[in-house]
């Protein structure tokens, strides 16, 4: 690193070069976050339920978190989404259309004790899942 009176050009050039060794900068500058994001930068996405799955909670908790495997309509990618609420999984059937959004973990990752699940189900067949769980609305018959 230049230390002298006229070292500004070298300092500037070095800082521009060395910031590529910072993983956060490299991911942002390379647009890698958007490339790897199944929702492609969108806040929500729609998909078709492929199957219901039970995900075991991480230690020290002991539970089976009810999740669904969803294939996104926009790009065909498959993701896991958590069904929030007591008995919420009973309102979701295979081949239903669901709307998912990020679960809100740090850096866009999974949250709490549910490993590998980054998304949460908000709507089932265009009806809010929370409304179905508390009994305020009924799931439409097809």
Curated annotation (Swiss-Prot):
This is Small ribosomal subunit protein uS12. One of its GO terms (cellular component) is small ribosomal subunit. It holds the Pfam family Ribosom_S12_S23. Keywords: Ribonucleoprotein, Ribosomal protein, RNA-binding, rRNA-binding. PROSITE patterns: RIBOSOMAL_S12 (PS00055). It comes from the Archaea. The gene is rps12. Disulfide bonds: none annotated. CDD domains: Ribosomal_S23. Coiled coil: none annotated. GO terms for molecular function: rRNA binding; structural constituent of ribosome. NCBIfam families: PRK04211.1, uS12_E_A. Part of the 30S ribosomal subunit. GO terms for biological process: translation.
